[in-house]
Curated annotation (Swiss-Prot):
Metal-binding is among the record's keywords: no
Upper lineage: Eukaryota, Viridiplantae, Streptophyta, Embryophyta, Tracheophyta
Protein's UniProt name: Small ribosomal subunit protein eS1y
Record region (Disordered): 1-20
Family from the record: Belongs to the eukaryotic ribosomal protein eS1 family.
Source superkingdom: Eukaryota
Amino acid sequence: MAVGKNKRISKGKKGGKKKAADPFAKKDWYDIKAPSIFSVRNVGKTLVSRTQGTKIASEGLKHRVFEISLADLQNDEDHAYRKIRLRAEDVQGKNVLTNFWGMDFTTDKLRSLVRKWQTLIEAHVDVKTTDNYTLRMFCIAFTKKRQNQNKKTSYAQSSQIRQIRRKMREIMTTQAASCDLKELVRKFIPEMIGREIEKATSSIYPLQNVFIRKVKILKAPKFDLGKLMEACSW
Protein backbone atom coordinates (compact mmCIF):
# COMPACT_ATOMS: atom_id res chain seq x y z
CA MET A 1 0.00 0.00 0.00
CA ALA A 2 1.37 3.37 -0.99
CA VAL A 3 2.08 5.68 1.90
CA GLY A 4 1.36 9.36 1.26
CA LYS A 5 0.15 12.54 2.90
CA ASN A 6 -3.33 12.52 4.35
CA LYS A 7 -4.67 15.86 3.17
CA ARG A 8 -7.55 15.69 5.62
CA ILE A 9 -5.23 16.02 8.61
CA SER A 10 -4.37 19.72 8.79
CA LYS A 11 -1.22 20.83 10.51
CA GLY A 12 -1.30 23.65 13.03
CA LYS A 13 0.16 26.94 11.72
CA LYS A 14 3.30 28.34 13.30
CA GLY A 15 2.81 31.31 15.59
CA GLY A 16 -0.96 30.95 15.78
CA LYS A 17 -3.51 33.47 14.47
CA LYS A 18 -2.24 36.93 13.52
CA LYS A 19 -3.82 39.79 15.48
CA ALA A 20 -5.83 42.19 13.30
CA ALA A 21 -4.43 45.74 13.32
CA ASP A 22 -6.72 48.53 14.46
CA PRO A 23 -7.28 50.80 11.41
CA PHE A 24 -7.82 53.84 13.66
CA ALA A 25 -4.53 53.42 15.56
CA LYS A 26 -2.56 55.32 12.90
CA LYS A 27 -5.16 58.04 12.33
CA ASP A 28 -5.93 61.39 14.00
CA TRP A 29 -9.15 63.36 14.42
CA TYR A 30 -9.34 66.99 13.28
CA ASP A 31 -12.08 69.57 13.99
CA ILE A 32 -13.85 71.10 10.97
CA LYS A 33 -14.29 74.87 11.35
CA ALA A 34 -16.93 76.64 9.23
CA PRO A 35 -16.51 80.27 8.01
CA SER A 36 -17.80 83.09 10.26
CA ILE A 37 -20.83 83.72 7.98
CA PHE A 38 -22.52 80.72 9.62
CA SER A 39 -23.89 80.66 13.18
CA VAL A 40 -22.35 77.30 14.16
CA ARG A 41 -18.56 77.16 13.74
CA ASN A 42 -17.70 73.64 14.96
CA VAL A 43 -19.44 71.47 12.39
CA GLY A 44 -17.83 68.07 12.90
CA LYS A 45 -14.66 66.00 12.85
CA THR A 46 -12.67 64.29 10.13
CA LEU A 47 -10.07 61.50 10.11
CA VAL A 48 -6.68 61.49 8.44
CA SER A 49 -3.64 59.19 8.57
CA ARG A 50 -0.81 60.46 10.79
CA THR A 51 2.31 62.04 9.31
CA GLN A 52 4.68 59.30 8.13
CA GLY A 53 7.92 60.20 6.37
CA THR A 54 7.13 62.42 3.39
CA LYS A 55 3.36 61.88 3.73
CA ILE A 56 2.17 64.88 5.78
CA ALA A 57 -1.25 64.66 7.47
CA SER A 58 -2.21 68.30 6.81
CA GLU A 59 -1.56 67.87 3.07
CA GLY A 60 -4.00 64.93 3.02
CA LEU A 61 -6.69 67.17 4.52
CA LYS A 62 -6.30 70.13 2.15
CA HIS A 63 -9.00 70.45 -0.54
CA ARG A 64 -11.15 67.80 1.14
CA VAL A 65 -14.84 68.74 0.57
CA PHE A 66 -17.47 68.35 3.31
CA GLU A 67 -21.23 68.46 2.69
CA ILE A 68 -23.22 69.86 5.62
CA SER A 69 -26.90 70.75 6.01
CA LEU A 70 -27.54 74.49 6.37
CA ALA A 71 -29.89 73.63 9.26
CA ASP A 72 -26.84 72.43 11.24
CA LEU A 73 -24.77 75.46 10.25
CA GLN A 74 -27.50 77.96 11.21
CA ASN A 75 -29.06 75.95 14.06
CA ASP A 76 -32.43 76.38 12.34
CA GLU A 77 -34.52 73.48 10.95
CA ASP A 78 -36.18 75.80 8.40
CA HIS A 79 -32.96 75.59 6.33
CA ALA A 80 -32.86 71.76 6.28
CA TYR A 81 -33.50 71.61 2.51
CA ARG A 82 -30.16 73.26 1.66
CA LYS A 83 -26.84 71.42 1.50
CA ILE A 84 -23.67 73.50 1.84
CA ARG A 85 -20.30 72.30 0.57
CA LEU A 86 -17.22 73.47 2.48
CA ARG A 87 -13.67 72.89 1.23
CA ALA A 88 -10.67 72.49 3.56
CA GLU A 89 -8.23 75.28 2.71
CA ASP A 90 -5.71 75.17 5.58
CA VAL A 91 -4.85 73.29 8.79
CA GLN A 92 -4.02 75.16 12.00
CA GLY A 93 -3.06 72.73 14.77
CA LYS A 94 -6.01 70.34 15.06
CA ASN A 95 -8.41 72.72 13.27
CA VAL A 96 -9.34 72.44 9.59
CA LEU A 97 -10.24 75.89 8.22
CA THR A 98 -12.84 75.71 5.47
CA ASN A 99 -14.38 78.02 2.90
CA PHE A 100 -17.66 77.98 0.94
CA TRP A 101 -17.43 75.60 -2.03
CA GLY A 102 -20.99 75.29 -3.35
CA MET A 103 -24.62 74.77 -2.48
CA ASP A 104 -27.44 72.45 -3.52
CA PHE A 105 -31.04 71.49 -2.72
CA THR A 106 -32.11 68.18 -1.18
CA THR A 107 -33.95 65.93 -3.66
CA ASP A 108 -37.11 65.73 -1.53
CA LYS A 109 -37.43 69.56 -1.42
CA LEU A 110 -36.98 69.84 -5.17
CA ARG A 111 -39.61 67.17 -5.84
CA SER A 112 -42.07 68.75 -3.41
CA LEU A 113 -42.01 72.00 -5.42
CA VAL A 114 -42.95 70.43 -8.77
CA ARG A 115 -46.73 70.33 -9.17
CA LYS A 116 -49.37 70.15 -11.90
CA TRP A 117 -50.98 73.14 -13.64
CA GLN A 118 -47.93 75.42 -13.41
CA THR A 119 -44.82 76.22 -15.47
CA LEU A 120 -41.33 75.46 -14.18
CA ILE A 121 -38.74 78.04 -15.27
CA GLU A 122 -35.01 77.48 -14.87
CA ALA A 123 -31.99 79.64 -15.70
CA HIS A 124 -28.27 79.49 -15.04
CA VAL A 125 -25.44 81.96 -15.47
CA ASP A 126 -21.67 82.14 -14.88
CA VAL A 127 -20.75 85.07 -12.65
CA LYS A 128 -17.58 86.56 -11.18
CA THR A 129 -17.41 88.07 -7.68
CA THR A 130 -15.25 91.06 -6.68
CA ASP A 131 -12.70 88.69 -5.06
CA ASN A 132 -12.28 86.75 -8.37
CA TYR A 133 -14.37 83.63 -7.67
CA THR A 134 -16.13 82.31 -10.79
CA LEU A 135 -19.45 80.68 -9.92
CA ARG A 136 -22.26 79.03 -11.86
CA MET A 137 -25.63 79.91 -10.33
CA PHE A 138 -28.82 77.95 -11.07
CA CYS A 139 -32.22 79.53 -10.44
CA ILE A 140 -35.62 77.81 -10.32
CA ALA A 141 -39.11 79.37 -10.25
CA PHE A 142 -42.75 78.35 -10.69
CA THR A 143 -45.70 80.30 -12.03
CA LYS A 144 -48.78 80.91 -9.88
CA LYS A 145 -52.35 82.04 -10.44
CA ARG A 146 -53.05 85.74 -10.88
CA GLN A 147 -55.32 87.51 -8.40
CA ASN A 148 -59.03 86.67 -8.87
CA GLN A 149 -58.17 83.99 -11.46
CA ASN A 150 -60.77 81.24 -11.87
CA LYS A 151 -58.82 79.20 -14.41
CA LYS A 152 -57.21 76.10 -12.89
CA THR A 153 -53.95 76.31 -14.84
CA SER A 154 -51.26 78.99 -14.67
CA TYR A 155 -49.10 78.29 -17.71
CA ALA A 156 -46.77 81.02 -18.99
CA GLN A 157 -46.27 81.60 -22.72
CA SER A 158 -42.89 80.94 -24.38
CA SER A 159 -42.23 84.68 -24.84
CA GLN A 160 -42.97 85.29 -21.13
CA ILE A 161 -40.66 82.42 -20.11
CA ARG A 162 -37.85 83.95 -22.21
CA GLN A 163 -38.40 87.37 -20.60
CA ILE A 164 -38.39 85.86 -17.09
CA ARG A 165 -35.23 83.87 -17.85
CA ARG A 166 -33.50 87.02 -19.12
CA LYS A 167 -34.50 88.87 -15.95
CA MET A 168 -33.23 86.00 -13.76
CA ARG A 169 -29.80 86.09 -15.44
CA GLU A 170 -29.60 89.89 -15.16
CA ILE A 171 -30.38 89.90 -11.42
CA MET A 172 -28.03 86.98 -10.63
CA THR A 173 -25.17 88.66 -12.54
CA THR A 174 -25.76 92.06 -10.90
CA GLN A 175 -26.01 90.62 -7.39
CA ALA A 176 -22.83 88.51 -7.70
CA ALA A 177 -20.70 91.08 -9.52
CA SER A 178 -21.30 93.73 -6.85
CA CYS A 179 -19.96 91.76 -3.85
CA ASP A 180 -17.37 89.24 -2.68
CA LEU A 181 -18.03 85.53 -1.98
CA LYS A 182 -18.68 86.11 1.75
CA GLU A 183 -21.39 88.73 1.06
CA LEU A 184 -22.91 86.59 -1.71
CA VAL A 185 -23.31 83.60 0.65
CA ARG A 186 -25.03 85.97 3.10
CA LYS A 187 -27.55 86.70 0.32
CA PHE A 188 -28.13 82.98 -0.35
CA ILE A 189 -29.10 82.10 3.25
CA PRO A 190 -32.26 84.31 3.52
CA GLU A 191 -33.02 83.86 -0.24
CA MET A 192 -32.63 87.59 -1.01
CA ILE A 193 -31.91 87.03 -4.73
CA GLY A 194 -35.00 84.80 -5.15
CA ARG A 195 -37.23 87.46 -3.61
CA GLU A 196 -35.79 90.14 -5.87
CA ILE A 197 -36.43 87.98 -8.97
CA GLU A 198 -40.02 87.36 -7.81
CA LYS A 199 -40.57 91.11 -7.39
CA ALA A 200 -38.92 92.08 -10.71
CA THR A 201 -40.87 89.53 -12.79
CA SER A 202 -44.32 90.14 -11.25
CA SER A 203 -45.25 92.43 -14.18
CA ILE A 204 -44.43 89.65 -16.71
CA TYR A 205 -46.07 86.72 -14.84
CA PRO A 206 -46.57 86.14 -11.08
CA LEU A 207 -44.05 83.65 -9.67
CA GLN A 208 -43.76 81.58 -6.50
CA ASN A 209 -41.05 79.38 -4.92
CA VAL A 210 -38.19 81.30 -6.54
CA PHE A 211 -34.87 79.90 -5.31
CA ILE A 212 -31.17 79.86 -6.12
CA ARG A 213 -31.26 76.08 -6.40
CA LYS A 214 -27.59 75.33 -6.89
CA VAL A 215 -24.21 77.07 -6.83
CA LYS A 216 -21.00 75.58 -8.26
CA ILE A 217 -17.57 77.16 -7.89
CA LEU A 218 -15.83 76.86 -11.25
CA LYS A 219 -12.66 78.81 -10.49
CA ALA A 220 -11.13 80.07 -7.24
CA PRO A 221 -8.39 82.72 -6.89
CA LYS A 222 -4.88 81.85 -5.67
CA PHE A 223 -4.87 80.75 -2.01
CA ASP A 224 -4.46 83.67 0.42
CA LEU A 225 -4.06 82.75 4.11
CA GLY A 226 -4.89 86.31 5.23
CA LYS A 227 -8.25 86.25 3.43
CA LEU A 228 -9.03 82.77 4.79
CA MET A 229 -8.28 83.93 8.36
CA GLU A 230 -10.57 86.92 7.77
CA ALA A 231 -13.35 84.64 6.44
CA CYS A 232 -12.98 82.36 9.44
CA SER A 233 -12.36 85.31 11.84
CA TRP A 234 -9.32 83.61 13.36
